[in-house]
């Protein structure tokens, strides 16, 4: 619901959060179940302490990588398992750009290759200027579909003279497409199937921009002109249980999600 998304975005200012000291991490027991439970607790703590990876140091990124790789996936063939179906909220993204939860940016990465990092940094700067930023990032996964919903806070101020933002509004960028099962742990999305919709949650802030509300851009058609429309982006699921999902993009980027109810 829009009101819920507002609260999530507003509760996520762009500032560092103290990271738990090494000695405060949970120590696992000798049983596999105990180890995985403790590992998941440590993943949650590190994800929160680095604001979804946005403020993580190289040491923290390496620790998260080690924690993720130490988990034993309890779900065989997670790409076709019913547990995958549902709504998932991003907790951590290993490159520091939470908006990469959206398959639109998977496609950008595939198209731009080594130049993609420059694009990600530019987009991050653009969304964070004047106190804006990316709020909650959700993935809604259904049978043969995946929808990404990222809340964005946009602000406008006068930084040369230190004014607070003149206004701040919230909206969502929703990208959806069709999926197919590549193998037991991987799903693919054809670039041509992608579409992106802009939703302006705070329509009263900038009434002049209300015409953008609900606008859908057929990004798949644009990408189809740039590259082979049959090309697809892929997401591999390396861990899945009732509450936690860990996925990996084609460039090795790790994404950690928790299940949420809407």
Identify the function of each model-found stretch.
Residues 19-262:
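Soluble ligand-binding/transfer domains with enclosed cavities or grooves
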């Amino acid at each position: 619901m829009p009101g819920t998304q507002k609260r999530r975005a507003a509760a996520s200012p762009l500032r560092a959060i103290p990271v738990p000291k090494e000695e405060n991490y949970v120590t696992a027991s000798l049983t596999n179940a105990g180890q995985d439970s403790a590992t998941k607790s440590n993943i949650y703590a590190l994800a929160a302490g680095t604001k979804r990876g946005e403020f993580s140091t190289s040491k923290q990124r390496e620790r998260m990588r080690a924690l993720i790789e130490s988990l034993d996936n309890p779900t065989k063939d997670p790409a076709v398992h019913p547990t995958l179906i549902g709504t998932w909220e991003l907790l951590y993204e290993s490159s520091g750009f939470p908006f990469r939860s959206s398959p639109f940016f998977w496609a950008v990465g595939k198209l731009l290759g080594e130049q993609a990092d420059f694009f990600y940094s530019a987009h991050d700067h653009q969304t964070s200027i004047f106190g804006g930023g990316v709020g909650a990032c959700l993935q809604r996964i259904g049978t043969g579909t995946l929808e990404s919903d990222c809340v964005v806070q946009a602000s406008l101020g006068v930084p040369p003279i230190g004014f607070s933002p003149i206004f701040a509004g919230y909206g969502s960028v929703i990208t959806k497409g069709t999926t197919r099962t590549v193998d037991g742990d991987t799903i693919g999305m054809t670039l041509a199937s992608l579409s992106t919709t802009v939703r302006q949650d705070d329509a009263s802030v900038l009434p002049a921009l209300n015409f953008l509300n609900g606008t859908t851009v057929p990004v798949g058609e644009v990408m189809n002109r740039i590259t082979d429309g049959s090309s697809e982006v892929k997401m591999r699921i390396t861990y899945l249980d009732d509450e936690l999902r860990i996925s990996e993009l084609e460039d090795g980027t790790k994404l950690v999600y928790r299940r949420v109810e809407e």
